[in-house]
């Protein structure tokens, strides 16, 4: 099943990148709430025991997701329901939780795939279990809550390997002969465990390679000034950094998806500006808009890379496949297999790895291990090697 272009992952504000929360609706009296939850649970169990084909997979993404039609085409409109979480998800967590609860209130919903799993995912998943919906498979993609927290609340967690990118990004910088590496982020992202792990590895590798690493704090796109302020900051700061390090090769990286178009644009016509990858590596992550490309919905990844290569080479890179989009695709495929009985376990590592490798050639799938050495057996990270666009020149 082909997935679509850049916007399909709804990354603009979230950016690669909780306690309990109330739902957005007015709470019902306790007895009524218990009765409703019992009815939903009973209906769900009845459907399961009857082997009903009325199952549904619910997909929750950000507001610019455009993948709905292809999922409906692949599985049938009766099997897929979609919704979005709000752009201002940090201040509207109740809305996110409410949407998850709404999915779980449908007894035919047997799996929820959320990507990005922004703050509110854990609280929403906990609420699903409190409703008695233990039959629902919960899959969190690209989570923004602490690994231990979201791992405990989910059946499966899927994420691009942020930490290991501290190696692959610096390897690309070394290949280019980079002198300075500029890292744009903001406090909210720098409080996220995997982003911090990547940052520390970037810093360690930069020091070993003799590359000067510069940390720059950018405006958070979820703050009051919004995404436009963050994008404008990037457009203004990149030329300043290049002027400061005049004559040196400067690589730029930002942890936020919504800043990628501005960063690509700012680097595009500057001969000493380098762009090792987007935060969520993909041929579609901002490149089509930045370069004015019309890539076909559901198009071939190699064709996309060839079109990008015709306009970019030597100073830009990304991953060969849209790993973030693939997380949703694999999540839905896995959910369908579990619901229909083709997959017996909620967490079947071998089947999951086979699914990823069948869709993303060369993917390295590992269980996440934190700084203390604790491994999470349901938290999977995905890593690909950066591409050389020269390899895609016709």
Task: List each language-model region with its residue ranges.
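Extracytoplasmic "Venus flytrap"
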Residues: 49-98, 103, 113-119, 195
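Hinge/cleft segment of the Venus flytrap/periplasmic-binding protein
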Residues: 51-53, 303-309, 315-394
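An alpha-beta-alpha
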Residues: 65-74, 157, 161-215, 335, ...
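Flexible loop/hinge segments that line or gate small-molecule binding clefts
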Residues: 128-162
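Short, well-structured alpha-helical segments in soluble
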Residues: 93-110, 127, 229-248
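Periplasmic-binding protein-like
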Residues: 57-61, 107-118, 135-141, 182-184, ...
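Bacterial lipoprotein signal-peptidase II cleavage site
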Residues: 13-27
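Extracellular/periplasmic periplasmic-binding protein-like sensory domains
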Residues: 202-214, 261-340
């Amino acid at each position: 099943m082909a997935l679509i272009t850049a916007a399909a992952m709804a990354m603009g504000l979230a950016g690669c990148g909780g306690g309990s929360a109330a739902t957005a609706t007015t709470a019902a009296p306790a007895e009524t709430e218990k009765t409703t939850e019992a009815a939903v649970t009973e209906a769900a169990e009845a459907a399961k025991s009857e082997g009903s084909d009325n199952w549904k997979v619910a997909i929750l993404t950000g507001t610019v997701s455009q993948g709905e039609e292809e999922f409906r085409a692949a599985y049938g409109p009766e099997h897929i329901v979609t919704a979005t979480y709000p752009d201002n998800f940090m201040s509207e967590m109740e809305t996110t939780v409410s949407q998850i609860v709404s999915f779980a209130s449908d007894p035919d919903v047997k799996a929820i795939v959320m990507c990005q799993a922004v703050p509110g995912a854990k609280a929403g998943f906990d609420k699903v279990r409190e409703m008695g919906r233990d039959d629902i498979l919960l899959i969190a993609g690209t989570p923004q809550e602490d690994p231990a927290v979201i791992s405990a609340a989910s059946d499966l967690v899927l994420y691009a390997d942020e930490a290991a990118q501290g190696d692959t990004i610096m390897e690309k910088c070394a290949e280019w002969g980079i002198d300075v590496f500029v890292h744009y982020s903001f406090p909210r992202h720098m409080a996220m465990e995997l982003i911090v792990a990547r940052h520390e590895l970037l810093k360690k590798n930069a020091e070993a390679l003799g590359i000067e690493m510069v940390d720059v704090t950018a405006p958070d796109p979820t703050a009051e000034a919004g995404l436009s302020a963050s994008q404008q900051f990037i457009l203004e700061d990149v030329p300043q950094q290049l002027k400061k390090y005049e004559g040196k090769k400067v690589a730029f990286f930002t942890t936020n998806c919504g800043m990628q178009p501005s960063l690509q644009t700012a680097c595009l016509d500057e001969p000493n500006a380098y762009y090792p990858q987007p935060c969520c590596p993909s041929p579609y992550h901002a490149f089509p808009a930045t370069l004015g490309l019309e890539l076909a919905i559901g198009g071939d990844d190699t064709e996309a890379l060839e079109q990008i290569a015709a306009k970019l080479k030597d100073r830009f890179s990304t991953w060969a496949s849209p790993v973030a989009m693939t997380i949703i695709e694999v999540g839905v495929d896995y959910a369908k297999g579990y619901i229909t009985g083709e997959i017996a376990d909620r967490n079947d590592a071998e089947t999951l790895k086979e699914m990823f490798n069948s869709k993303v050639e060369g993917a390295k799938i590992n269980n996440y291990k934190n700084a203390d050495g604790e491994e999470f057996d349901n938290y999977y990270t995905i890593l690909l090697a950066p591409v050389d666009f020269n390899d895609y020149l016709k």
